[in-house]
Amino acid sequence: SGNAITAKGLNDIIPPVGLVFWRWMVAIPILVIIAWPHLKYDLKKIRENWKILIILSFFSITAYNTLLYQGLLYTTAINSFLINASRPMFIVLLSIVFFRNGINLTQSFGFLLASLGTVNIIVEGQVGKLLALDFNIGDLWILGGTICWAIHTVFLRKSPSMHPASFLAITVTIGAIILLPFYILEIIYVAPTPFKLETVGGVLYLAIFASIVAYLCYNRAVEIAGPNKAGQVSYILPISGTVLAILLLGERIELFHIIGLPLILAGIYFGSKDK
């Protein structure tokens, strides 16, 4: 929850690509120190599996956070939490698309409910906006980021068997390298990253807690429980995130949030049923 809250609080101060870039640049040396004892043993696996590592790095490290932070320029943190809550449904759907995983009638019903809830939030409960394709661009950016995270989660099953710290260190490094040209373009055409007390504090929080701690825990959860069950963390995030957005950012919960969230959570519940 702290990732989107911090990014929303800083989006009037620091451009989105710069925030993502410096978040990872601060995290990299810390990760390398943590992973150093394991990297020499995993180096061969890194060389042999560079293609899948680039794919995972792009969709999680580069694309997901950039799209999320870009979207938060135009929409609320509450919307971002509720749209992100639909990740388990995209994980199930993409598992079918890429790996031919089966889906039963109950899971199909769950996907329908979650989709209705997500669309309800994006169109703010107004059917006219849906018919006119009048969407908040910020919500669409975040939806794109949500799909990127689902792709990352699904393809984690193809990642090489290596120490979690080594895996995170190499994917963060690759992701930051991919992000570098976009950061340079942002400096030239949008604005440079200002280095102030609040930006430094925000970047440190994102680098340590939202990057290192959160990613290590999530990747480990996927390794142990599988992508579908690990994605169930989305039950908790929209509720805790909404509370934090109200308390820390002064955001308001609207009727379309109240309608959309139960639909998404019900969709996650039915979508996780194997039978």
How should each PLM-predicted stretch be described?
Residues S1, M25-P29, S115, A150, ...:
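Small-residue-rich packing faces within the transmembrane alpha-helices of Major Facilitator Superfamily
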Residues S1-F21, F58, K129-K158, I177:
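Glycine-/small-residue-enriched transmembrane alpha-helix faces in small-molecule transporters
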Residues I5-I13, L43, L73, I122-F135, ...:
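Membrane-interface helix termini and inter-helical loops of multi-pass transporters
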Residues L31, L94, I103-G125, L179, ...:
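Hydrophobic transmembrane alpha-helices of multi-pass small-molecule transport proteins
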Residues S1-T6, V32-N84, N120, A207-A225:
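Specific transmembrane alpha-helical segments of multi-pass solute transporters/efflux pumps
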Residues D12-A63, P88-L93, C148-H152, A169-I188, ...:
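Transmembrane alpha-helices of multi-pass small-molecule transport proteins
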Residues V20-W22, N65, N79-S86, F155-I177, ...:
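Helix-helix packing/entry segments at the starts of transmembrane helices
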Residues L10, L19, R23, G71, ...:
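Hydrophobic/aromatic residues within transmembrane alpha-helices
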